[in-house]
Amino acid sequence: MTELARLKFYATQPHSCSYLPDEQATTLFLDPSQPMDVHVYADLSEMGFRRSGDHLYRPHCQNCNACVPARIPVAQFLPDRNQKRILKRNADLTVMPAKPRFTEEYFDLYQRYIEERHADGDMFPPSRDQFSTFLVRDLPFSRFYEFRADGRLVAVAVTDLLPNGLSAVYTFYEPAEERRSLGRFAILWQIGEALRQELEAVYLGYWIKNCKKMNYKTQYRPIELLINQRWVTLN
């Protein structure tokens, strides 16, 4: 473990919660002057931190603990029947890694995704600056995994490669390809990729029981939840 006690953190003022509209949220950030070291990142991921752009953060709310960090221990994962169907349905896709960068092809897909799937969220309306600030960072451990069907871009899984696992930062995909269940397929692919790289887990971010948009995360079993600073298996 890195010497985490030497790191500095800053908490925001309370602000509106993006997931639970009746709640106020506080966010804890790693000091942005601290270099984005992959080993620090890996250690903080074990403590429930996530990356957004150049920042590592986790919820630090005074009166709410609804945001529960979740990860999939990939060596124990077994796909259910529906997940096997999703894998079969997308067997024609090719997946290639790319360096994070801005292209009109990426942004056009991202724009369609946000407008169709998240028009009620705080990322709407999508913009080029938002895309670049959120996803296009010059970090040696970050990848854009491109999913293509006959050369046509249908999904991008923004993924961080850590010593202890893969962190699923964000995935955006073609909303017209609903039958493929591309968001779920991207996670299944990341599980397979973590196994191929002999890594321990895929970090999915936060699961919130009362947020319907988060329900899909517990469909991958077993899943581990960080509760009282311990990873607990939910079978």
UniProtKB/Swiss-Prot annotation:
Pfam families in the record: ATE_C, ATE_N
Reactions catalysed, as given in the entry: N-terminal L-glutamyl-[protein] + L-leucyl-tRNA(Leu) = N-terminal L-leucyl-L-glutamyl-[protein] + tRNA(Leu) + H(+); N-terminal L-aspartyl-[protein] + L-leucyl-tRNA(Leu) = N-terminal L-leucyl-L-aspartyl-[protein] + tRNA(Leu) + H(+)
UniProt EC number: 2.3.2.29
Molecular function terms from GO: arginyl-tRNA--protein transferase activity; leucyl-tRNA--protein transferase activity
UniProtKB keywords: Acyltransferase, Cytoplasm, Transferase
Subcellular location: Cytoplasm
An example Gene Ontology biological process: ubiquitin-dependent protein catabolic process via the N-end rule pathway
Broad class of the protein's primary localization: cytoplasm
Transmembrane annotation, as ranges: none
Primary enzyme class: transferase
CC terms in the record's Gene Ontology section: cytoplasm
Tree of life domain: Bacteria
Alphabetized InterPro entries for the sequence: Acyl_CoA_acyltransferase (IPR016181), Asp_Glu_LeuTrfase (IPR017138), N-end_Aminoacyl_Trfase (IPR030700), N-end_Aminoacyl_Trfase_C (IPR007472), N-end_Aminoacyl_Trfase_N (IPR007471)
Family: Belongs to the R-transferase family. Bpt subfamily.
NCBIfam families named among the record's database cross-references: PRK01305.1-1, PRK01305.1-3, PRK01305.2-2, PRK01305.2-3
HAMAP family (UniProt xref): Bpt
Protein purpose: Functions in the N-end rule pathway of protein degradation where it conjugates Leu from its aminoacyl-tRNA to the N-termini of proteins containing an N-terminal aspartate or glutamate.
Protein name, entry field: Aspartate/glutamate leucyltransferase
Species assigned in the record: Pseudomonas fluorescens (strain SBW25)
